[in-house]
Amino acid sequence: MRPILPALLVLGTPALAYPVTVRSCDREVTFEAAPEAAVSNDVNLTEMMLVLGLTDHMIGYTGISGWNKLDAEMRAGVDELPELSEKYPSKEVLLGAGTDFFFAGWNYGMKVGGEVTPETLGAFDIAVYELTESCTHVMDKPKASMEDLYADLLALGTIFGVPERAEELVAGYRAELDAMLADLAPLETAPRVFVYDSGEDSPFTAGRYAMPTALIEAAGGTNVMDDFEKSWATVGWEAVIEADPEVIVIVNYGDVTAEQKRAFMMENPAFADISAVENDRFVTLEYVEATPGPRNIDAVATLAEAFRAE
């Protein structure tokens, strides 16, 4: 696993001339200067801030410990920053902290029609940049791809006046991914893959607009829910059984462990004929690997190895 704060990224970079404008979903947002009181929501978005070396511009983060997603590496990265809210922050929390920038997404700290949105915060001069993967909740967008991650890192680099730092990081990710994939043995056919996030009565999974679709495809597989016109959402078990996935990716977070999720599927007679269950082909991704963020490259490597396992 690569460190959250690579040494090369904490070095100084030339200052960027302001104002700058970036696209955030269906909006264009202009910044007259780099934010100085930024707040990020969720572990993956916060790691994007950390990997770009932006902690000096932050006053805190939200939405991590409420879902038990803070690992040792992440805890060290945010050691000097307060968690302003264990789950989604209220408008009052952000205002009370003196926030001038909120990095969040739809269902990553904001809800469509909720009290915390770009419009409600904009009235108090709090700028918002929305996670690209989540834009499907407010506009039409292409299916998920690795470009979603790269776009967010480059936009953050522009917003905070470190575009060269972001460009170097993204170029490194591209090169690492290309080199890794070039070394992989070809697959005869793309394995059918189902993402099991949570839920027993009905599974919460990744559709065509969620990052795991991009990770699975980069690793050589195909998401059996690729025709599901959603990002992260609930489906029926009948659809999973009918799709007959050959590999099941378990997203590990929260109170139910990955092993408990695997046991639920292995011990349920209704799933006995699913190929992945029959052959015990499960692979675990941590939440921070399965959602858009710096650990996506490691996630592709994990999936690629699992897809080629005997």
Model-flagged regions — what are they?
Residues 108-118, 126-155, 189-211, 259:
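Extracytoplasmic ligand-binding site segments that recognize negatively charged/polar headgroups
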Residues 24-26, 81-92, 112, 134, ...:
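Short helix-initiation/N-cap motifs at beta->coil->alpha
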Residues 67, 205-232:
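Alpha-helical, coiled-coil/dimerization segments enriched in small aliphatic residues
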Residues 143-154, 158, 247-310:
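Structured C-terminal subdomain patch of bacterial secreted/periplasmic proteins
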Residues 3-5, 12-48, 158-196, 305-310:
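Bacterial Sec-exported substrate-binding components of ABC uptake systems
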Residues 40-97, 101, 106-110, 224:
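A short, structured surface patch at a secondary-structure boundary
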Residues 44-47, 64-67, 101-102, 107-111, ...:
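Solvent-exposed loop/turn segments at secondary-structure junctions
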Residues 91-101, 119, 235-244:
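Short helices/loops that flank or line small-molecule/ion binding pockets
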